[in-house]
Amino acid sequence: MRNAWQWLVVFLGAVASAAAAPFMVVVYNVENLFDADGRAAFEDYQPARYSRAHVLTKLQNVATLLAQFEGGRGPDVILFQEFEADATPGATAPDCDAILRRYAGVRIEEMLGAKFDDAVADLPAEALLLKAMADRGMTGYRVIVGENITAAGTTRALAQTCVVFTRFPVKAVRSHPTVDARAILEVKVEVDGAPLYLFNNHWKSGASDPVTEAVRVENAKTLRQRLSEILRADPNADVILGGDFNSHHNHKRRNPAMAVTGVNDVLGSQGNELAVRGTQRDLYNLWFELPVEERGSDAYRGEWGTLMQMMVTRGLYDYRGVQYVDDSFGVAKVAGLNVDAKGLPRRWTFEGPAGGGFSDHFPVYAKFLTVPDNRTDRWVALRRASVESAEPAEGRKVDFAAVDLERVAVRAEQVPADTSLRSDAYRGKIVRVEGTVGPGRRLTVSFLGEVYDVWSFDEALRERLRERFKAGETVRFYGELGQFRDRWQFVIPDESWVK
């Protein structure tokens, strides 16, 4: 357990045995990376809101963040979620190497600008990102795209898919259809002659919903069945499971009313690092590498979540083939890039002529290496083996009181005359509000000539605000501007914002 970011910029020092250079695996939900063909299943990604300039911003931001790894070289393996399932696919899969050769003398800015044509419009999102990364010196990737297939019982078509970028030779690929979720992408690579299985997941959304948990149970069964097949053939097979599981690492503990959870009960994710040496548990969840106060890749209603996950099998702790580097797991939060003023993921926004932001999830990462010993009877010596400690059942609260409101807030005098806050330019901004409370049960405030709802995801705080804010009175607070069901609102996440 250590500074979560240091592994990205400091070369790994002492390692357990003579081995090949450590390599990095990153898991990253990019929050809807769509291409530039002007066709999309989501309304927000139609040309009216998602122009070529937006595509370019999205690509450049993803590439910029990935360039923070390995001294600008980028990770050797990336498990991506939320790439657009190409709405205009060709008869054959695109040849990404050929695409890079074709556009070797053209930068991505030109491809989406003055040199944009039908051929560029026809390129899928993964090819565009590959080019944006190549322009920054991140090269040598093989690209594997999950098939847009689902299992029987799926209720609707899906617009996203999972994608893997890897520098290692690819030996086998399978897409496993599952109910109401993106196909689970299995990629078998070879690292210094050793086989390594990668499983890229994006399970059904709605982490706290018991109805959708039943679907995630089915997603877990799909993955568990294939994992069990591999481990029956070789109990010490090297397998990395990654992705957006739309479940927390301690999902069972956080949702005690759920009789069966997909990630813990069916898949078998758990936090006892030594247990995988035995025969009863074959998966270890890397979130347990971090102290409780550092666990969080995303946030919902003021609580940190751990939807982005990486799990490893027992084989990654032995001395054959690929080996996990102890305590190397972390969360990629880069100040000034993908972290907002509240310390949360700086999510994508359509605001302005070119959009901005990164994703509503922080990426997670871990280091691995290969060992030549070929011994499955010897285990990595752990500095401090993790256990499933008594973690609080509720999610860890976001520390909104720590936000420097004076520094980040938009003030009334900064808003140009005759300009409405009700626009993408101000959506998501923290605003210093001084206004008049409106009448009625719904708490509202009149500010700069317009009426806004005042809301908090903390129910107790909402009630206190209703008692404290009386109709006709002047109130002062900081609120995050947003929109819910076509109503504009200021969200007050913490009582310390009322001042």
Regions found by a protein language model. Give the residues of each.
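N-terminal, active-site-proximal structural segment of metallo-dependent hydrolase catalytic domains
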Residues: A18-A159, K342, E351, L369-A401, ...
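Beta-strand-turn-beta hairpins that frame and shape the catalytic cleft
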Residues: A20-V25, F34, F168-A172, A181-S205
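Structural recognition of the beta-strand scaffold that forms the well-ordered cores
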Residues: M24-V27, D76-Q81, R142-I144, C162-T166, ...
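Catalytic metal-binding/acid-base residues of hydrolase active sites
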Residues: E31, F83-E84, H202-K204, F245-H248, ...
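Conserved beta strand-loop-helix elements of the APE1-like EEP
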Residues: L128-R136, G153-A172, G302-G321, K367-L369
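Metal-dependent phosphoester-hydrolase catalytic domains
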Residues: S175, V179, E229-A237, S247-Q414, ...
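A long, amphipathic alpha-helix that forms part
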Residues: T212-P235
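OB-fold single-stranded nucleic acid-binding module
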Residues: E273, A385-K499
